[in-house]
């Protein structure tokens, strides 16, 4: 008998710092991760950056897909990321033409 193992859903998220910089990451719990970043327990790149605002998040599938999607988004220019934030698509696919 085989057991069905439930794998968590992953999300891609983008945060904006008070200086307008955008930070992209992945997580299984967006609220928890935002709280970690805001309390200095998240990415070192965001420590001391002041208030953070969640400006975008979407379902990214499994961890492997989320990592690939995160890489693709991090390769975008700031203007392309801003367009993504403005458009607020519900889902993103690795194969999609990126902004």
From Swiss-Prot:
UniProt family annotation: Belongs to the UPF0213 family.
Listed Gene3D superfamilies: GIY-YIG endonuclease
Residue stretches making up the GIY-YIG domain: 8-83
Lineage: superkingdom: Bacteria
Name of the protein: UPF0213 protein PC1_0597
């Amino acid at each position: 008998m085989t057991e069905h193992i439930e794998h968590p859903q992953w999300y891609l998220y983008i945060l904006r710092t008070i200086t307008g910089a955008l930070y992209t990451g992945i997580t299984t719990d967006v609220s928890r991760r935002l709280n970690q970043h805001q309390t200095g327990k998240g990415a070192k790149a965001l420590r001391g950056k002041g208030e953070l605002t969640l400006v975008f998040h979407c379902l990214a599938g499994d961890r492997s897909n989320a990592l690939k999607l995160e890489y693709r988004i991090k390769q975008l220019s700031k203007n392309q990321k801003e367009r993504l934030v403005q458009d607020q698509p519900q889902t993103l696919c690795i194969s999609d033409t990126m902004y």
